[in-house]
A protein has these predicted regions:
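Short beta-strand edge/turn micro-motifs at domain boundaries
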Residues: 183-185, 190-231
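N-terminal secretory signal peptides that target proteins for export/translocation
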Residues: 1-2
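Short, flexible beta-strand-to-coil junctions
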Residues: 13, 86-93, 187-191
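Sec/Tat signal peptide C-region and signal peptidase I cleavage site
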Residues: 16-20
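Surface-exposed, charged secondary-structure patches
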Residues: 116-189
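Cleaved targeting-peptide boundary
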Residues: 21-29
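Sec-dependent N-terminal signal peptides
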Residues: 5-14
Length: 232
């Protein structure tokens, strides 16, 4: 009995290690509130590292998005990965503003592939029609906690993006300059494979991370059941 109790204690401590020595930080812009917590970093690889970002709203414009990136979320790999979800949603609302947001947080070589794919997937309508299996305007919601195809991709609030370390260790960039690529999983119920790989780059002497590659965030997800109600 004692052995079982000790084993359960070890398992619990192991599960909590991903957030060890990590405090939740909060940042506000007007009435919008953002938080982040996690131990994911480019400094060293930790297979138990995790990250979580919450937000009450999608940034209203480029100015808010830029401030959020430069002052808060862009300073961590998980914060930057979560901002890719926001940028995708902004692109769905306004192509030009969304393009600016995508260019801001992405490494240059990744920009065109993201925009090309989103333009194709989002089509011209503001919201996806019922049971649309291709023009998936709801893609940004597919990685938000609580959102599933069955509930019309309606996430819990505040919106939450959960992440954890990939099985792939950090890699030094050998082409297109220098830096270290952090591989992480963004969790989402929109696919059979719920671990969506995102590559985030940290370059020397640069305070902010950049999205290096992220096709798993905009590949075909499960078809919505019902009509998507959008995000606020």
């Amino acid at each position: 009995m004692m052995k079982r109790t000790l084993l359960l204690m070890v398992m619990t401590l192991s599960a909590l290690t991903g957030f060890a020595q990590s405090e939740q930080k909060t940042w506000s812009y007007g009435s919008h509130t953002y938080t982040q917590q996690g131990t994911l970093t480019a400094k060293q690889y930790d297979k138990r590292a995790k990250g979580v970002v919450t937000f009450t709203n999608i940034p209203s414009d480029y100015e808010e998005f830029e401030a959020l990136y430069t002052q808060f979320l862009g300073k961590t790999p998980h914060g930057t990965a979560a901002m890719m979800v926001m940028a995708m949603e902004i692109y769905g609302r306004d192509r030009e503003v969304g393009k600016q947001c995508i260019e801001l947080i992405n490494y240059p070589s990744n920009v065109n592939s993201v925009i090309s794919r989103l333009k194709d997937k989002f089509g011209t309508s503001a919201y996806a029609p019922e049971n649309d299996s291709y023009s998936q305007r709801y893609l940004p919601a597919a990685v938000l906690k609580g959102a599933t195809p069955q509930n019309g991709y309606r996430p819990q609030q505040p919106y939450t993006v959960e992440m954890k370390a990939s099985v792939n260790k950090h890699q030094e960039l050998q082409i297109s300059g220098s830096g270290r690529v952090v591989y992480l999983y963004v969790m989402g119920k929109g696919w059979d494979t719920e671990q969506r790989t995102v590559e985030v780059l940290r370059q020397p002497n640069q305070p902010l991370y950049k999205i290096f590659n992220c096709p798993a965030l905009y590949t075909q997800c499960k078809t919505i059941q019902g009509t998507w109600q959008g995000l606020k």
